[in-house]
């Protein structure tokens, strides 16, 4: 999987599934956690948190791609 493929998947899902009270980073984190199970490893092991810090979404997705491709 490439970064662009994951980004497209996540942002497409965000358009139809994100609750209005979620920030973008919350949705990205929860989506990745549910679909791929790597969000917590990226947050805690890699130290990249987009759940609380929306500005980290790009770095978070990059780290997720690396972990997804290692599976």
Language-model features: locations:
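Charged low-complexity stretches with an acidic bias
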Residues: 52-71
């Amino acid at each position: 999987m490439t970064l662009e493929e994951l980004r497209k998947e996540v942002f497409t899902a965000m358009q139809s599934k994100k609750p209005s009270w979620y920030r973008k980073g919350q949705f990205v984190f929860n989506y990745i956690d549910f679909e791929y199970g790597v969000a917590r490893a990226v947050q805690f092991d890699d130290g990249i948190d987009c759940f609380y810090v929306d500005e980290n979404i790009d770095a978070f997705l990059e780290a997720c791609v690396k972990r997804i491709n290692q599976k």
